[in-house]
């Protein structure tokens, strides 16, 4: 709402739309928040994300197996690097193929599973502007920032299906009103392509 022109330029990137539509189909809802980790910032514990990823193991166990299977299909997690991030700065740790572990929403808090994660995760250095998208059931955790002076900054994206429910509440009317003018102006003067507008 404070910088709609910047928002339009940032999120009009066709690559972001392509990743989101490939996972969720059209009419998805995007929420975003900046994650800033200063030098010395500690690593997160391995976890899964929304929806069931934020529940206790006991609460997750009350949902039938098909809900565990469906939940990660309703959301796409993403991140856009706002600075160069070498391995020392602690980019996100990922456990390949862990999204296939069906009881993962119940298991991720177990110490034996966390130990397995720490022994087998991978990390990818990112350059400013790089994006990463992944299934929210993939076990992941922000790494420890062991750098002396790099403030690791990532724009975390949570993209929800048109049939899902976003974790954050969004004032859609206010956002539409704020973006209408900049979108219309960029379209009228040719600074926005049809692919970017979509």
Predicted region positions:
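Short, surface-exposed secondary-structure boundary micro-motifs
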Residues: 136-138
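Long, low-complexity C-terminal extensions of enzymes
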Residues: 183-198
